[in-house]
Structure formats: structure tokens, C-alpha cells
């Protein structure tokens, strides 16, 4: 019996190959139960001759905390974006904009980074993705259709607010934002949005030098991280900060970043670290590796160092100074104010730890942030590798040397959120005896007790002279004024604006050929503001700018609708708040400077000065955008306008000029 079973087994083994040959699909079906993969490209991709982009939404899950308010409920979502070069031209430094509009927060994106900064990114108004590794999209022709070189898939994970059900809300649009490309409106079907972008035939590209890495970008603040010298365990880096915005500014700047691979700063020139903790160095990975190093002489071992500019007296110091554009006490001004103060440079010796112990291992720090005092808020993107920076040869010969490696970080000015500004504006006009003060909590209400005041109430109208009085001394006057004008006021009065700097825009006159206004700056802080500047965006009416009498003024190109102004030479100093004549009785007096501005109406068509054209659309102080009132002063019925009102304005400007001069000369 055993012999018979053995014969049957051998016979079966001999027949198996014949069965497989005769019925090949039988064995395949038994071994593999998965359906055949469909490699057919999307119809839009097959028809596109240019750059194809798509966005596909996945499901979403409800996050904590759970709330009954549907618009406040947070959901996690996943989606996939794809960009493919289907044309005959390589796309350098591709930039894909996704028009999110449901308060999305992008937590991660594989294959790409956001130009708005490191994750998580607030994408409420959309965000632009750029390649993290595959920064350029080569053509299918030159790569034999290698998808890894002609395309990038972006797996997006994030948080979205509001909506119903488990379907993820779709973005408004997707488009390629590179120069010279145009995209039609994207088409949507189901949970997928797609578009085919093509070259704009009318676009005339500027002649560009071919680059190995991503071309350098333009922003409000341009930071370059150059590696100048390289050793096995360390390298010398130079950081250059360029203020390229006509309205950008930083005072006492603080720069911070995050080391990602255990590096530390051994020494610095042209700047210094705010904190120096030897114990932190000894307990780090670097302290274990560099056992014989005297860490008491090390500049900083923090993962997130805070770096500051040196004061001016250190400029010629042999150890810490003697660098061009260094040592200005953290001041960065616009180029047209002072080119020598529009740039900052410092150098640092960076020590590395294993496994980066070779001369070609460079990893720039990430999560760059920079801020100042009463300055605009900057949002910095990730460091992007660019072609090496050229430098004049230090020998003095007509030769050029290059950095070993260079990265660029772009920082742009962000618009302040409501109740988060650092300066505010009040409105008044010659045809109304009530002034509209700064908005409630214009600069935030975090440091006050909102139980005693209403943080959301509209401010009470005031007599114009009350704008000179600190907020704490306005309450009684505001109530009396409301009673005189038969205006109701709430039992719980509005909270203050809490701004250290405020501006008053007073519409002074409106006549046939022109109009005038008076701008007044108030400093409610204890510290004086040096080298201040302001800017007024007046829209179409700004084209008629004629003169500003007590300040230096000029138009800001290219639109010429924004008026830039600063103090006259030797008078660009806005003092802080001071005590009244009798401190026990009189309120404090803010630092104040003012001037009249005149405008023409010729060749500007119809202007409704009182209806809104005579009030600024945006106001800036030291680069920071100030919060504006939500409405204008109303014209009283029956009031006539007279051009003769312009004469007192000029006299007021002259009087103000002499008063400021006398105050500065006497030191009061």
C-alpha cells in the first residue's frame, strides 16, 4: 500500500508542469486573488500638454474636543495632490498653489514643503507647495518617461474646521504660480479637482542665468545662509539679512532657528547669543562627543538659540566685530532711508556631531523666525538650497570666490489679525466735531481684566481734543460727550485699544482743486522711537499728493498711491509719554508729532473726499500695519465746505514745526 501511494505521488509531481502549461490561468487564480492593477492615467493627464495638477480629497475624522457648534468642530483630513510635467519644457522650482478656504491647518506633506513656513502651516487663505527633494520637473522626453523625475505626489495631512458629514471640503482652486504659466479654472468631479496649465505665449521672460539649484526668490526679508569654510567636524557659516521691502523695518531684531542634528555654535562674530548655559552643553550629545572641549568658552548649545545684533560700540572689536554691515544694535531700515542700515551680517563657527563627521555634511537650521519691537510680523519659509553665493576675492585681485554651499530663507510681512496689531488709527474731520477713536482692543486685550470692560463693544465717540488724553482719563469725558450728543452708551464700557503707538488722521479741508489732511503721531510708551517712519495708502487719491509740510515725504513706487513720510533730519525722534505739569492732578502727555498734507484733484476724475476717498485704506508705522476704524466721520447736514479752511492748516503746520524744534532744542 505504501509503495502504491509513492507511485501516485511521483505521477502527480510529473503531471503538475503539464497542467500548468495547459491551464496557466488556473494556477495564477489559485495563487493570487488580487485584481489586476489599472495603470491607465487620468483622462486629464493624457490630454494635457503642459503641467498637469490634481487634488483628490480623502475621508476625515472628527477630532477632540467634540462640540455642538458645527463651524467650530475640528476634523483631521487626508488628501493627495499631484503635479506632472507633460510638456516639452523643464519646470524649474515648481510652485503649486492650493486654495484652501476652510481654516485648514496643514500638519504634514510628503514630497513637498510649504512656502509659508514649517509645518504646521495656517492655510486659511491657501498655501503654496514647493518640492522638498524633487524641486524641478524634468521632461518625459529627456527621462524616457521616468515618473520619479517628471512628477511629484504630495500626501497631505491636516486639520479642517466646519462642514457636515465625512467628506473633506475641496479647495477653491489649484494652479501653478511660476512666472510665465497660466492656468484655467480647475474642473471638479466627485472628490477630485484637476487642471492643465500651459505656457503664456505673451509672457516675455527675463534673461536668466542657468542655475543648478532652485532660483533665488524675492521677499520682504531675504536671509542667506552661506557655508564659507568646511572641516570634518565643523564649518564656518555666514548669515546675511537683507531688508528688501520699502515699508519693512526691524528694531532690536531677534533671530531664532532650530538645529535638527545636534549642532551647536562654538563662536560668533557680528552677533551674539542671548543665553549661554555651560551645563546645557555638557549634558548634550555634543558634550559626550567633545569630551575634552572647554564648553565654558562656547557661544551657545541651545537647540533653538536666540541671536541678537551687537551694539555699535563693538563694530571695531577685533574678536566680535570688524564685519561689514554688523553692529547696528539690531536696526534694519528700508534701503531708501539708509542703505547702510538695510543689511546685517554675522558669522558663526558650527560644530557637528556624529554621524555628520565629514567635510560635505551640511544641514542648515530650520524653523527660522525673526521679530523686533513695534515692527511688522514676519513669517519665514524653509531654507531652500540655491546656487553658491559669489564673493569678491579677499586678496583684492579681480577674481570671484564662491561659498561652499548656500541656502535662502524668505520672510514676508503678514497682515495683523483683528485685535492683534501694534498700532492703531483714529479718524476725525472738519465737518464733524466727534472723533472716531481707535478700535476696542486694537492691539489686544490679553493683559487687562475684561470683566470690567467690554472687549467687543464699539468705542464711544469723543471730542477731538480728548485724543490727547490717556484712555484711563477719557471715561468721564466720553460719557459727558455722549449725553451732549444724545447718544446712548452701555453700562459696561468698551475696553481700551492698548496700543503703544496711535495715529490720528484728520480731514482738514475739501475744496475745488484739492484737499488737505493732518496726521498726528502719538507715542503712549515710555521709550522714545528713533528714526521712525510712516506710510499712508490712499488709493487713487494718493496720486494727487502735493506736499507734507513738517515731515519728509515721497511716493512709494510703482503705484505711487502710498505716501512714505519720516521726520526731518535731526527731528526723527518721537519721545515717549511724560508727566503733566502737576502729576498729581494732570494726566500724562504722549509724545506727539504732526504735519499737514496737501493734495491736488487734477486729472484724477471724480473723488469723493468726504465719502471715503479722503481717508487712508492702510496705515503703517515702522513697517507694522495699524488697525483702522471700521467707519468714517459723517457729514453734518447743512454744513458748507470752504477752501479758506486750508490757510489755517498751513499756519498750524508751521506752528507745529517750530514747537517741535523748540522742544527738541530745549530737551523738554
Curated annotation (Swiss-Prot):
Subcellular location per the Swiss-Prot or TrEMBL entry: Cell membrane
This protein's UniProt keywords: Cell membrane, Glycoprotein, GPI-anchor, Lipoprotein, Membrane, Signal
Sugar attachment sites: 69, 125, 254, 318, 329, 358, 412, 432, 473, 552, 560, 579
Chief localisation class: membrane
Membrane topology: Lipid-anchor; GPI-anchor
Residues bearing a lipid moiety (GPI-anchor amidated serine): 636
Keyword Glycoprotein: yes
GO BP annotations, alphabetical order: cell wall organization; cellulose microfibril organization; pollen tube growth; pollen tube guidance
Protein name: COBRA-like protein 11
Family annotation (InterPro entries): COB_C, COBRA_pln
Annotated signal sequence range: 1-29
Keyword Cytoplasm belongs to the record: no
Functional summary from the UniProt entry: Involved in the deposition of apical pectin cap and cellulose microfibrils in pollen tubes. Implicated in pollen tubes growth in the female transmitting tract of pistil and toward micropyles, via the perception of ovule guidance cues.
Entry GO terms, CC: apical plasma membrane; side of membrane; vesicle
Tissue: Mostly expressed in flowers, stamen, anthers and pollen, and, to a lower extent, possibly in roots, stems, leaves and siliques.
Amino acid at each position: 500500500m505504501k509503495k502504491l501511494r509513492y507511485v501516485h505521488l511521483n505521477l502527480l509531481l510529473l503531471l503538475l508542469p503539464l497542467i500548468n502549461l495547459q491551464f496557466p490561468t488556473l494556477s495564477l487564480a489559485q495563487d493570487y486573488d488580487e485584481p489586476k492593477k489599472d495603470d491607465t492615467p487620468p483622462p486629464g493627464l493624457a490630454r494635457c500638454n503642459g503641467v498637469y495638477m490634481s487634488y483628490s480629497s480623502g475621508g476625515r475624522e472628527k477630532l477632540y474636543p467634540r462640540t455642538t457648534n458645527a463651524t467650530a468642530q475640528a476634523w483631521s483630513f487626508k488628501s493627495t495632490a499631484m503635479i506632472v510635467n507633460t510638456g516639452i519644457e523643464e519646470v524649474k522650482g515648481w510652485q503649486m498653489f492650493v486654495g484652501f478656504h476652510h481654516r485648514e491647518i496643514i500638519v504634514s506633506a510628503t514630497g513637498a514643503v510649504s512656502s509659508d513656513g514649517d509645518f504646521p502651516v495656517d492655510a486659511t487663505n491657501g498655501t503654496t507647495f514647493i518640492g522638498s527633494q524633487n524641486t524641478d520637473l524634468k521632461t518625459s522626453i529627456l527621462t524616457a518617461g521616468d515618473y520619479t523625475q517628471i512628477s511629484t505626489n504630495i500626501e497631505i495631512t491636516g486639520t479642517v474646521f466646519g462642514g457636515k458629514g465625512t467628506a473633506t471640503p475641496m479647495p477653491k482652486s489649484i494652479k501653478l504660480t511660476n512666472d510665465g504659466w497660466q492656468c484655467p479654472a480647475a474642473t471638479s468631479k466627485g472628490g477630485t479637482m484637476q487642471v492643465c496649465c500651459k505656457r503664456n505665449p505673451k509672457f516675455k521672460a527675463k534673461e536668466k542665468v542657468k542655475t543648478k539649484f532652485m532660483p533665488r526668490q524675492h521677499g520682504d526679508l531675504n536671509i542667506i545662509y552661506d557655508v564659507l569654510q568646511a572641516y570634518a567636524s565643523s564649518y564656518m557659516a555666514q548669515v546675511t539679512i537683507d531688508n528688501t521691502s520699502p515699508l519693512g523695518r526691524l528694531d532690536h531684531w531677534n533671530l531664532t532657528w532650530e538645529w535638527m542634528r545636534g549642532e551647536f555654535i562654538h563662536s560668533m562674530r557680528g552677533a551674539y547669543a542671548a543665553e549661554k548655559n555651560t551645563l546645557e552643553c555638557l549634558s548634550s550629545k555634543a558634550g559626550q562627543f567633545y569630551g575634552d572641549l572647554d564648553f565654558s568658552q562656547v557661544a551657545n548649545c541651545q537647540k533653538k538659540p536666540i541671536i541678537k545684533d551687537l551694539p555699535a560700540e563693538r563694530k571695531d572689536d577685533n574678536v566680535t566685530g570688524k564685519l561689514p554691515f554688523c553692529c547696528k544694535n539690531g536696526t534694519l531700515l528700508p534701503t531708501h532711508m539708509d542703505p547702510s542700515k538695510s543689511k546685517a551680517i554675522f558669522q558663526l563657527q558650527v560644530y557637528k556631531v556624529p554621524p555628520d563627521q565629514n567635510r560635505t555634511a551640511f544641514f542648515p537650521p530650520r524653523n527660522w523666525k525673526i521679530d523686533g519691537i513695534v515692527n511688522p510680523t514676519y513669517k519665514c519659509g524653509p531654507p531652500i538650497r540655491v546656487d553658491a553665493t559669489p564673493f569678491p576675492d579677499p586678496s583684492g585681485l579681480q577674481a570671484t570666490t564662491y561659498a561652499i554651499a548656500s541656502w535662502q530663507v524668505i520672510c514676508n510681512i503678514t497682515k495683523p489679525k483683528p485685535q492683534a496689531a501694534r498700532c492703531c488709527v483714529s479718524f476725525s474731520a472738519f465737518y464733524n466735531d466727534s472723533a472716531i477713536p481707535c478700535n476696542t482692543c486694537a492691539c489686544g486685550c490679553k493683559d487687562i481684566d475684561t470683566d470690567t470692560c467690554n472687549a467687543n463693544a464699539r468705542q464711544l465717540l469723543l471730542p477731538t481734543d480728548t485724543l490727547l488724553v490717556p484712555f484711563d482719563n477719557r471715561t468721564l469725558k466720553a460719557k459727558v460727550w455722549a449725553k451732549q450728543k444724545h447718544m446712548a452708551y452701555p453700562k459696561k464700557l468698551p475696553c481700551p485699544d492698548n496700543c503703544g503707538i496711535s495715529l490720528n488722521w484728520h480731514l482738514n479741508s475739501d475744496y475745488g482743486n484739492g484737499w488737505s489732511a493732518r496726521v498726528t503721531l502719538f507715542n503712549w510708551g515710555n521709550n522714545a522711537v528713533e528714526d521712525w517712519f510712516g506710510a499712508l495708502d490712499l488709493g487713487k487719491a494718493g496720486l494727487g499728493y502735493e506736499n507734507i509740510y513738517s515731515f519728509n515725504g515721497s511716493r512709494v513706487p510703482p503705484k505711487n498711491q502710498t505716501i512714505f513720510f519720516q521726520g526731518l533730519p535731526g527731528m526723527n525722534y518721537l519721545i515717549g509719554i511724560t508727566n503733566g505739569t502737576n502729576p498729581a492732578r494732570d494726566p500724562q502727555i504722549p509724545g506727539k508729532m504732526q504735519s499737514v498734507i496737501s493734495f491736488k484733484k487734477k486729472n484724477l476724475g471724480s473723488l469723493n473726499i468726504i465719502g471715503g476717498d479722503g481717508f487712508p485704506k492702510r496705515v503703517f508705522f515702522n513697517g507694522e500695519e495699524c488697525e483702522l476704524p471700521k467707519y468714517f466721520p459723517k457729514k453734518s447736514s447743512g454744513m458748507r465746505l470752504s477752501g479758506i479752511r486750508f490757510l489755517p492748516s498751513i499756519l498750524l503746520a508751521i506752528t507745529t514745526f517750530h514747537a517741535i524744534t523748540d522742544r527738541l532744542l530745549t530737551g523738554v
